[in-house]
Amino acid sequence: MAAEDPSVSGVSGRYATALFELARDEKSVDAVKADLDKFNALLDESADLKRLVRSPVFGADTQLKALNAVLDKAGIAGVAANVLRVLTTNRRLFAVADVIRAFNALVAKYKGEATADVTVAEPISDKNLDALKAALKTVTGKDVALNVKVDPAIIGGLVVKLGSRMIDSSLRTKLNSIKHAMKEAG
């Protein structure tokens, strides 16, 4: 399965594939995904946790003790906790974000879903999110999960990445196009 999806490759892909197959066999795909998403959110929120995960300065024992404390406090257990411990023991914790991303890609494929990365200038309403999901479902023929990121630098509009396709209707891109057209004309 991993060879079919370019986002599921390398070391991260192997861990994600093994994790997915184990979760599928135990019929706990949704629970594992929820736990990994919870850990990913903690990683995004905590600079200290990011440093622990990324820095080679911390030994495996130190990382494992800290990770166990985080997992206990967050209520992450079972298969998801075990794979995080294995990553730590094998000195691969730095790849956890890629493992989670690859696992989510495998889950989406398993469920017949597609995942789109959406960048907006300001938070988008639920009504508009639902309309965007419906439009993307019409195009892809699949249910579409959205990963929404707010980036004020795009000024307005949105950027949608779905697989190898990208739709950029941001105001920043339109202004850059006008700027280039004016440079060529003048």
From Swiss-Prot:
GO terms for cellular component: plasma membrane; proton-transporting ATP synthase complex. The gene is atpH. Its main location: membrane. It is a peripheral membrane protein. It is found in: Cell inner membrane. Belongs to the ATPase delta chain family. NCBIfam families: ATP_synt_delta, PRK05758.3-2. Keywords: ATP synthesis, Cell inner membrane, Cell membrane, CF(1), Hydrogen ion transport, Ion transport, Membrane, Transport. The keyword Cell division does not apply. One of its GO terms (molecular function) is proton-transporting ATP synthase activity, rotational mechanism. It comes from Bradyrhizobium sp. (strain ORS 278). HAMAP family: ATP_synth_delta_bact. F(1)F(0) ATP synthase produces ATP from ADP in the presence of a proton or sodium gradient. F-type ATPases consist of two structural domains, F(1) containing the extramembraneous catalytic core and F(0) containing the membrane proton channel, linked together by a central stalk and a peripheral stalk. During catalysis, ATP synthesis in the catalytic domain of F(1) is coupled via a rotary mechanism of the central stalk subunits to proton translocation. This protein is part of the stalk that links CF(0) to CF(1). It either transmits conformational changes from CF(0) to CF(1) or is implicated in proton conduction. F-type ATPases have 2 components, F(1) - the catalytic core - and F(0) - the membrane proton channel. F(1) has five subunits: alpha(3), beta(3), gamma(1), delta(1), epsilon(1). CF(0) has four main subunits: a(1), b(1), b'(1) and c(10-14). The alpha and beta chains form an alternating ring which encloses part of the gamma chain. F(1) is attached to F(0) by a central stalk formed by the gamma and epsilon chains, while a peripheral stalk is formed by the delta, b and b' chains. It comes from the Bacteria. This is ATP synthase subunit delta. Gene3D superfamilies: N-terminal domain of the delta subunit of the F1F0-ATP synthase.
